[in-house]
Amino acid sequence: MVITSMAFEKLDFKRSNEIEMMKRSKSFHESIIKRRTVRDFSDEKVPIEIIFNAIKSASSAPSGANKQPWHFAIVSDPQVKHKIRKAAEKEEKEFYDNRAPDDWLKDLDQFGTDSRKPFLEVAPYLIVVFKKNYDLEGDKREKNYYVNESVGIASGFLLAALHDSGLATLTHTPSPMGFLEKILDRPKNERAVLLIPVGYPAKDAKVPKLNKKSFESICSTF
């Protein structure tokens, strides 16, 4: 091992037998494939501790040089959610009317989406994921590494943790997202990358029937 100033500790790892490993891998697969993008939420309250636990799980994700270049903002205040909805719908209307290329709109048409985003107010929580290209230590900038990759992995952890907790989510990416930094008064080194409504699905919630690519088409062995 290379000599380093960092302290190390023994890995906390308990090896399971292959039968148990197969059961666990199958159980996770059967659970995660039931996760769906939901646009119709119930306004029923959710204990915030569940949201905290999911974000704690997300923050355990690996990151470049362990810089942890992320920040998670939880929004439940109705007035703040209203501001976010209005700003998001303004950007989305511009997107649908003027910015989106025709092929993108054609691909979106089958889902029946438009610039209206009521879920941003109905869902009890919004989680905004911010990336930090650099950290600020006073006036000094400290560079972060593999920021997009690190935040992407953490976001995946977050979605899986929320689903495992029994909650529905939507990955919403209005573009541009600068309004989130302004509304939530985030520092200049943070950029919003993901807006996630979280809650229980509405009782009459429906999702599109989707076909996923075959395993053979998305995986190769060598």
Enumerate the language-model features and the residues they cover.
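Glycine-rich, charged/polar anion/phosphate-binding loops
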Residues: 57-59, 110-115, 180-182, 205
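Glycine-rich phosphate/pyrophosphate-binding beta-alpha loops
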Residues: 59-65
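Short, electropositive alpha-helical surface patch
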Residues: 180-194
